[in-house]
């Protein structure tokens, strides 16, 4: 049996529970954990809110099974609904279960320790493994396929946009030149190539390939598009008084979360108007006053918490219909990208074209 409790330590657990709990105090409250993983956060939510039910979504079937077993052992299975899906299918998951509104939505965007430590998934640059990087192994797109089929311009774009890699062009050119002689099949091959390309004097702390690995993982799984699609779905599904709580682990995720939440935290009128109409008032309340970070004690106990940023908002009034419509259109457009991207290696081109049309 896998020792789940020792594999994965939930990040900022007390803060997350304190943010979620007030929305789950009433009878028949419903919470959604969009990134269930090994259920560390969700178990704490259910223990704190004994009247609540929780829907746990995860695209990793292995993690979902382990989480369900853990819920059974904790005596919480009767209030837990596991769902095998990507979190950007939130609307469909709730519709299929006849649920119109929920009370709290939680997202922990970090990789689980199970995924990082599993040697055959290729998420980590610390040991050799196949270039896979899929969170859902039923999906066709892998890191190996990207490195074999994307042209240099596509590789530059994902390394620059998703990895913020300074040497994107040099790495992309080296990949294209190398694959003509020998295909990339393992993480060790990619590690060696990046090590040869990135100058010693300009390397970030740690492994020089970490940004390339991050970029490939985001591209394989469509992570940022899925996040940008899920946030508006979550907002549209929350009751007034409902809460959206999100943990992110790199700047691209945090920027996406911060930008989305900011839409509901500001007055929706041009500057200088003498009177602000009621319908233009903010519809979110900032619960974290920016972002909560892990303190030195948590980082010492759980080094993977070092980069976390926790943000949360409460729906303070009915979201105006124009905003609901805007959220729905955003989610639908990005879901179309994800459907196309998961079936072909052209995700980068599809996304780029959509973003260009939107300006």
Swiss-Prot record:
Signal peptide: none
GO molecular function (one): rRNA (cytosine-N4-)-methyltransferase activity
Feature: compositional bias, Basic residues: 350-359
Major location category of this protein: cytoplasm
CDD domains hit by this protein: AdoMet_MTases (cd02440)
Keywords: Cytoplasm, Methyltransferase, rRNA processing, S-adenosyl-L-methionine, Transferase
Region named Disordered: 339-359
Compartment(s) where it occurs, according to its Swiss-Prot or TrEMBL record: Cytoplasm
This protein's record includes keyword Methyltransferase: yes
InterPro entries registered for this protein in UniProt: RsmH, SAM-dep_MeTrfase_MraW_recog, SAM-dependent_MTases_sf
GO annotation, cellular component aspect: cytoplasm
Annotated positions binding S-adenosyl-L-methionine: 39-41, 58, 87, 108, 115
Protein origin, superkingdom: Bacteria
Biological role stated in the UniProt entry: Specifically methylates the N4 position of cytidine in position 1402 (C1402) of 16S rRNA.
The family this protein is said to belong to: Belongs to the methyltransferase superfamily. RsmH family.
Official protein name in the record: Ribosomal RNA small subunit methyltransferase H
Gene label: rsmH
